[in-house]
Amino acid sequence: MKRLFVVGLGPGGRDGMTLEAKKALEQSEVICGYTAYADLIREDYPEKEYLVSGMTKEVERCHMALLAAQDGKTTAMICSGDAGVYGMAGLVLSLAEKYPETEVVIVAGVTAALSGAARLGAPLMNDFAVISLSDLLTPKDVIEKRLRAAAAGDFSICLYTPSSK
């Protein structure tokens, strides 16, 4: 079976990775990802083939990973935190429609919001909101509306990407 794992590495490398993430990386022949994330784990998986690229090359990286999987190599697309929270899972799934023979497996990771809350001794209880301040894909007025709504709801708010355009 042609398989692409989309793996959340957690908040900073091997210490924050789940056992499932480590297992997916061990099973993979190819690891694809942003250069800085690959550098975090390269020492632990030196025998793997690495396909890396720089920031803003997300679509290109997804295609590289999907092509490697399509060629029959079990592949892992790595991202920081959780693959589904501002990670690569959504983009991979949308592009995977062009690769119907490739099974995409999402491997959850620990988000920066949850890790940060734990380190601060401030558990996120009784509901919380996670909001990205990046206006690259979301208009600024929509972000501001979300912030006002979360504040009005008296939620603890975890903010991602504090700088943008």
Label each residue range with its predicted role:
Residues 1-104, 110, 115:
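Class I S-adenosyl-L-methionine
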Residues 3-7, 75, 103, 113-165:
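Beta-strand/loop-alpha-helix module characteristic of Rossmann-like adenine-cofactor folds
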